[in-house]
Amino acid sequence: MSSHKTFKIKRFLAKKQKQNRPIPQWIRMKTGNKIRYNSKRRHWRRTKLGL
């Protein structure tokens, strides 16, 4: 990844960074909740973004 990024790329990376977090604990506590963890987590070394 270059140090000089276009705004489009930077915005894309920012979105992916926001998506890549665990689910909040209060969501797990909700009644009738079936979500245990965020299945769409991405590890920076294992799975690369399609850039």
UniProtKB/Swiss-Prot annotation:
Keywords: Ribonucleoprotein, Ribosomal protein
GO cellular component: cytosolic large ribosomal subunit
Record GO terms (molecular function): structural constituent of ribosome
Residues that span the membrane, as ranges: none
Pfam family, one: Ribosomal_L39
InterPro entries recorded: Ribosomal_eL39, Ribosomal_eL39_CS, Ribosomal_eL39_dom_sf
One GO BP annotation of this record: translation
Family from the record: Belongs to the eukaryotic ribosomal protein eL39 family.
Subunit-structure text: Interacts with IMPACT.
Protein name as annotated: Large ribosomal subunit protein eL39
